[in-house]
Amino acid sequence: GLESRGLGDVYKRQVYDYPIHQNDILPTVAEAAGAQIPNDRIIDGKNLIPYINNEIKTPPHETLFWISGRLKTVMHNEWKLIKDEKINKNWLFNLSNDPTERNNLAEANPIKVSELELMLFNHMKEQSPPVFQSSLSIPVLIDKHGGQEYVEGDEYLYWDN
């Protein structure tokens, strides 16, 4: 969600509960500032102002994607798939039933994994190649903060910078 702090009386402080993406910042700030968005390229984000002002009642995104090297995520409606291609592992969560992502449903739901993988594949085909390749790939423990040590059996994934 989003917490907006107002711009005078125009946009009062409020909390917005639907998922948004960092790509939404540019179109939203540009609209608030009265600036033009470049039309010579695709801008992935959406202007959130009509959503925040309840002019549009539906969520701004049905599907969101995050890509960091070999770590890829797609969130579609209530489902979220995280793929770590380095260790060939998937995590699938039903966010309606498991908002804190504790119960990996990937093995029990191979059809849903395949559906989301196809969405991710199609999204990746539309993307420009990275300008810079990752220079670092580090293991990150799942559900542990950086000060906690790895214990045999802990789950982890690899994050590419």
Which residues make up each language-model segment?
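Single conserved hydrophobic/aromatic residue that forms the stacking wall/gate
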Residues: 1-11
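Beta-strand elements within well-structured catalytic alpha/beta cores of enzymes
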Residues: 5, 25-30, 93, 98
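Polar, surface-exposed loop/tail segments
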Residues: 13-74, 133-135
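Conserved beta-strand positions that form and line the central face of beta-propeller blades
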Residues: 1, 15, 47, 91, ...
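Residue-level detector of conserved, well-ordered beta-strand and adjacent loop positions
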Residues: 66, 75, 93-96, 106
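Generic preference for hydrophobic
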Residues: 10, 64-65, 81, 92
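Short, surface-exposed beta-strand/loop micro-motifs that present aromatic residues
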Residues: 70-83, 91
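Long, internal low-complexity/basic segments
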Residues: 25, 77, 88, 100-161
